[in-house]
Amino acid sequence: CLRVYQERVEYWSQFFDYLPKFSIRIRKMTTRWGVCNRGNNIVTLNSELIKKDITLLDYVIVHELSHFKEANHSNRFWNEVSIRYPNYKEARRALRD
């Protein structure tokens, strides 16, 4: 499980030019798929994502890494996400179902 998360984070990180040195945490969360803590440079990913299609894990990773540039969900934030993950709206819908 951890290996898959690490491989996907490593893959997606190459598409960002503004990432700080950050750590990954995997834990079960009840209300979120991921969290980016910019204060201590930790990205936490929900362990339940491993049960979903790999493309949804990819979306959450791109979403959280984009928070290193844009803290909130502004239009600029969604532009950052869409540059790297154009089908983000479909992924968001799938995670809500």
Q: What label would you give each PLM region?
A:
Residues 1-59, 68-97:
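Active-site-proximal or metal-binding-adjacent scaffold patches in catalytic folds
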Residues 64:
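Walker B catalytic acidic pair
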